[in-house]
Amino acid sequence: MEQTWRWYGPNDPVSLNDIRQAGATGIVNGLHDIPNGQVWGKKAILARKEIIEGSSLTWSVVESVPVHEEIKTRTGNYATWIENYKQTLINLAECGIDTVCYNFMPVLDWTRTDLEFEMEDGSRALRFDQIAFAAFELHILKRPNAENDYSADEQLQAKVYFDNMSEAQIAKLTANIIAGLPGAEEGYTLEEFQAQLDRYKDIDKETLRNNLAFFLKELMPICESYGLKLAIHPDDPPRPILGLPRVVSTIDDINWLTTQVPEKMNGITMCTGSYGVRGDNDLVNMIKQHGDRIYFTHLRSTQREKNQKSFHEAAHLGGDVDMYNVVMELLREEQRREKSGNIRLIPMRPDHGHQMLDDLKKKTNPGYSAIGRLKGLAEVRGLEVGLKRAFFNK
């Protein structure tokens, strides 16, 4: 696998030199300063590429080109936004970048309730607490009909949770959920946030699916012409939240999407942490069935808690993800590609990492501190080397 690292640009506290020292050779990056929907010009793309290559690294994957909300809802100026997206893809391809990760999650890119969850060893991780999230929906946001999404027991626990929160805790939980995270442009007040949710009140899973398929069918001629691979990121968490539909959460979703849009440039990002939150997602089988569609992979693990909808980010080789067999199957897919003449390695990045050691004293992007990802990359690299020597170099 190609060892890559997500970098948030010149303002990222983790420098390109740090990334080189971690052993990564590829950079995963996006032009986050350009508003959603606007065209990424060649001048801006080449300027960023020059910075990356100036540190003897390669811009391997774009993560991500955000999809405008009006494309997802297929309302307003969606046709204009699609044309802009096409031009951005053309510009990226003509600048030598051939893989783009994106997502089709309504409103929020990814959601956690705690960005500083303390682990037993004193490091910090990201966490999603189902009861805290219920307290937010039911008693802070007060989303209409939110009670329909929670059991009576969860509603009771959420009320107790909320009643014991201070004003500061309410503000922090709210900020964690709706204030926006690294790589995302949007941040909302409660009122603005509810207004965004309301845009989807008449959009169910089938409608959102069809909007995604429509969008991809518009892009495929360009992708096929330029050899540019799209790799959709799964929903995080992989189930409906906030009354919003989700369309990339299970193998059934992948089956549907690849049937509706069969072109090979329509691919997936295998994010083991996102898919792995669901106990009914067999990650190894997903790779076996759709390995030829995997153009990018995020390797991390999560640990489901007593409430199976709650989880926290585990160590890369721990938690619920069978990382041994996941990496084994990815290496088998690379071997299949090599035999067919495709020598391009699958770009892999150690997704997220615990905040630990000296990084505990620093301001870092949630999930994207240097040392935790350095540890994760080293562990996955060691696993890959061991598997290759034992099974693939004979």
Curated annotation (Swiss-Prot):
Put simply, this protein is called Mannonate dehydratase
Q: Which family does it belong to?
A: Belongs to the mannonate dehydratase family.
EC number, UniProt record: 4.2.1.8
Name any cofactors this protein relies on: Fe(2+); Mn(2+)
Which gene produces this protein?
uxuA
Tell me, in a sentence or two, what this protein's role is.
Catalyzes the dehydration of D-mannonate.
Q: List this protein's GO terms for biological process.
A: D-glucuronate catabolic process
Looking up Pfam families in the UniProt record yields:
UxuA (PF03786)
Name the domain of life this protein comes from. Answer: Bacteria
Xref: InterPro entries: Man_deHydtase, Xyl_isomerase-like_sf
Broadest EC class? lyase
User: Which keywords describe this protein according to UniProt?
Assistant: Iron, Lyase, Manganese
Q: In which pathway does it act?
A: Carbohydrate metabolism; pentose and glucuronate interconversion
- MF GO annotations: ferrous iron binding; manganese ion binding; mannonate dehydratase activity
Reactions the enzyme catalyzes: D-mannonate = 2-dehydro-3-deoxy-D-gluconate + H2O
